[in-house]
Design a protein with these regions (language model features):
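Beta-propeller domains
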Residues: 189-192, 197-205, 220-261, 284-286, 384-520, ...
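Fungal secretory targeting signals
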Residues: 1-19
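Immunoglobulin-like IPT/TIG beta-sandwich domains and homologous Ig-like subdomains
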Residues: 226-237, 245-251, 631-707
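Blade-edge beta-strand/turn elements of extracellular beta-propeller
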Residues: 198-207, 254-263, 305-327, 346, ...
Length: 716
């Protein structure tokens, strides 16, 4: 069946893409310091800001042939040689204005536009116009809101380029329209730093076809992977009624995929697992009745998918939607299962319309009970209100004290859900925006009793604004939120990345995949795909944590996913950066819909390591409690084995570079005997559900860094 390559939509409230409007700042080309432009822009002679064609990858050395720039491994030019020190838009080194001026597309070594124009004669004296600035009445401000100013607005006096009042670096920094704006860049984040190749880089292999665009994904208790998408005008799977399927279940063992049916549009939803192991998909978008009249409005949708490690009859069953609804509509919400098994749901657009308008936004949270049914109240959350319009898909992690770390835009806090209050506001993370539509990635590093389960959180990547010209951020921040003097430790990837996602690996490292070196989230808004795997070792010294892995051949841009499988490999799928599926690349659509899936084999299973897996793993119990209980683990190891880790792993719900609920624990162990082949180890569960909230987990036995096949357990 040939897929349609485009679709003309009629008038509708359903939105294909949220557009973030911002006021482009002017600049001072004579300034030798901060000109006033946004990151990734330069000030030209007429005092306007234009995109700079500059790479945000670490500089590469000059080539002997005088070629340079993005098409030549980001090579730079040597100002001392005969060619010249500027790289032109066409990738040639030179020294003329065609090579060196940013307005002509100079890529690196560019000249700064610091020459001011001559003052013009005038026949009148300067005069100040009558002030027409009106203080805000609703927290919006600036050119798009009648020129209003923030004045003494309770959240802050700076008017951001997006038209909201506040006092964070996102308001008072680059693009600030009025108020006490910073006159110099705020604590600039470090740029890209080259990383050495990993001695065992791993490998990518194309393994099959997802059947539907993989916008959302989760590893289910039956070991299979759920893919969930929005309503489309084409997928590769059909339901029994002849219509397209928008969800699928993939078996990594047999490489088979089967269609799943849902009733409400799950476009850009959130999700989490209930305590009983059921996957819950939350929120979505409106119905597209002209495409599929059988799929209804999903703004308040609640969808349930149940699978079991012991009951194979559940595999292939459709989503269940008994009619439960959220209290308020939510498009782009984030979800976290709490220690008491309730579900915390935060943020989302009410209608997909302009996020610069308060009436379109939902900067609130609501609580669902342990069965995934709303308790019926949406409560305003100040951090989200202040972050507008960068309030959607916030990063959320559960901490050891039962409170939440919540991050959005550039700001974060510790939030007490039970008390509905901010416990502690944390310092802003320097650099660009980190959440939608310039999402980077975030992980909570592996937890253990060695430091009393104290969490450290890493956030990497991001971007400056929602446009294909936006530079991406190479910097990463790492913070221990519960520390008394919590602050960000800065580090850098070897290149800027937007839409990069971090996946915890059983050996304690973090794999970073997917994304782009330029642009933002949205349809057709990114280019220069980042194809290389990056490996982060949190135990290494600062400056030595990053290495580069293997390189994929498949761009993974907007709407891509990555997650760990039971065998310790990583499944990568998706990339659908278009309104409706496009199957072949064209000049207008260089990055079509991607159905091919890949497996990334990490270093610990590469080469000779593949033969070192622990074998014959037996768990004393698969019903575990986070109350300090112990259980025995039997397994066979090589006769030269030196140490073991028992890992408790929750993959969470994956979408838009977020891994909601994702966490990994090292359990305390005893009884391991180095050099013995038949092992019996006692593992101790964490002391409470703050550390391991209830739900499905995978146990990995890891011997000398190599994991055995994982086994699903339920934690209560």
């Amino acid at each position: 069946m040939k897929a349609p390559l485009g679709l003309v939509l009629g008038a509708t409230v359903v939105q294909a893409n949220i557009v973030f409007h911002y006021v482009q700042p002017t600049c001072d080309s004579s300034s030798l310091n901060f000109s006033g432009c946004l990151p990734g822009q330069v000030c030209v002679l007429n005092n306007t800001c234009v995109p700079a064609s500059l790479s945000t990858r670490a500089d590469a050395p000059p080539r002997e042939d005088g070629r340079c720039g993005k098409d030549f491994d980001d090579a730079t030019c040597d100002s001392e040689d005969d060619y010249g020190g500027c790289c032109s838009s066409q990738g040639y080194c030179g020294k003329t204005g065609a090579h060196c001026l940013p307005k002509n597309g100079c890529q690196n070594g560019c000249e700064s536009s610091t020459t001011s124009t001559s003052p013009q004669p005038t026949d009148h004296e300067p005069a100040l116009g009558k002030p027409e600035e009106t203080p805000t009445s609703d927290g919006t401000c600036g050119a798009a809101n009648g020129g209003s100013i923030c004045g003494d607005w309770e959240l802050g006096s700076c008017c951001s380029m997006m038209g909201f009042c506040g006092n964070t670096s996102a308001h008072c920094g680059a693009g600030c329209q009025s108020g006490p704006c910073d006159q110099v860049p705020v604590s600039p984040a470090p740029g890209p730093v080259p990383a050495p190749p990993h001695p065992t880089p791993g490998s990518f292999k194309i393994v099959g076809d997802s059947g539907v665009p993989a916008m959302h994904a989760a590893l289910m208790p039956n070991g299979k992977v759920m893919f969930l998408d929005k309503v489309e005008n084409y997928t590769k799977l059909n339901l029994s009624n002849g219509r397209f399927a928008y969800s699928a279940e993939y078996d990594p063992v047999t490489n088979e995929v089967v269609p799943l049916r849902y009733k409400t549009n799950a476009f850009c939803a959130g999700g989490s697992f209930l305590a009983n192991g059921t996957l819950l998909s939350i929120g979505g978008n409106g119905n597209l009745s002209w495409l599929d009249p059988e799929v209804e409005d999903g703004w308040k949708g609640l969808r349930y998918l149940t699978r079991s490690a012991s009951d194979a009859s559940l595999s292939g069953e459709d989503w269940i939607e008994p009619g439960n609804r959220l209290d308020t509509a939510r498009w782009y919400p984030t979800v976290q299962t709490m220690p008491d098994a309730t579900i915390f749901v935060a943020s989302g657009s009410l209608n997909g319309l302009d996020p610069a308008k308060n009436e379109n936004n939902n900067p609130t949270y609501e609580i669902l009970d342990k069965n995934g049914v709303t308790k019926g109240e949406s409560i305003s959350m100040e951090l989200l209100v202040k972050a507008q319009p960068y309030y959607m898909y916030p990063f959320i992690h559960l901490l050891a004290d039962g409170n939440l770390f919540v991050f959005t835009s550039k700001s974060s806090e510790i939030f007490d859900v039970g008390g509905g209050r901010t416990v502690k506001s944390l310092p802003d993370l320097t650099g660009d925006y980190r959440t939608y539509p310039n999402t980077g990635g975030s992980v909570i590093l592996p937890l253990s009793s060695a430091n009393d389960w104290n969490a450290e959180i890493v956030i990497c990547g991001g971007g400056a604004y929602q446009d294909i010209t936006s530079p991406t951020d190479a910097s990463c921040g790492r913070i221990a939120p519960l520390n008394e003097d919590a602050d960000w430790e800065m580090d850098s990837m070897p290149e800027g990345r937007g839409m990069v996602e971090g996946t915890l690996l059983p050996d304690g490292t973090v794999l970073w995949l997917n994304g782009a070196n330029k642009g933002a989230q949205g349809f057709g808004l990114a280019e220069d795909p980042t194809l290389e795997a990056l490996i982060y070792d949190p135990a290494a010294k600062l400056g030595e944590r990053w290495s580069t892995g293997a390189k994929s051949e498949i761009p993974r841009l907007y709407h891509s996913v990555a997650l760990l499988l039971l065998d310790g490999t990583v499944l990568i799928a998706g990339s659908n950066p278009v309104d409706m599926p496009v199957l072949e690349a064209t000049n207008e659509t260089p990055f079509p819909t991607e159905f091919r899936m890949e497996i990334y084999t990490p270093p610990y299973l590469s080469g000779a390591n593949a033969e070192k897996r622990p074998q014959n793993v037996e768990l004393e119990s698969k019903e575990l409690k986070a109350d300090g209980m112990t259980f025995e683990v039997l397994f066979d190891a090589l006769d030269d084995a030196k140490e073991v880790e028992i890992v408790l792993y929750h993959g969470g719900f994956v979408t838009h570079s977020l891994h909601m609920g994702h966490r990994m624990l090292y359990l305390d162990t005893g009884g391991f005997e180095a050099g013995k082949t038949e092992q019996k180890v006692e593992a101790t569960m964490p002391p409470n559900s703050n550390i391991a909230p209830p739900g499905p987990y995978v146990v990995y036995v890891v011997v000398d860094g190599v994991p055995a096949m994982g086994q699903f357990v339920m934690v209560g």
